[in-house]
């Protein structure tokens, strides 16, 4: 189980990035300067900037959270077993927020301070692992290739 410093994260903005080619997901807590720099980069260059500047600086630090391939199962489980890309914070931790990059292969979304506070409060009130255990087997088999015992353990292990 991943441990988070919710008080510190609550003061930051979160950025979600996903490279659909490898299907790996990351969350980063950005300060205002990080967000300002990211927004100043042209949209078509933001993903590369995120990889080269933000990820390079933050990966492995307390300001990063790797979700590996578990992000997809988490997304389904937070939606009760259904895929939900509606911009509904706090239950759409993965895709909710402002879209900064969206292509066929990559997506970056930004959660503002209030979104982060709402997510933190939601996770304090609702145990993510319990949500996953409750909803994992409700995921449609046709849409989720990891719906098996190993997929459940992987999703729980990264949550």
Language model segments and positions:
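Acidic (Asp/Glu-rich) sequence patches and key acidic residues
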Residues: 2-158
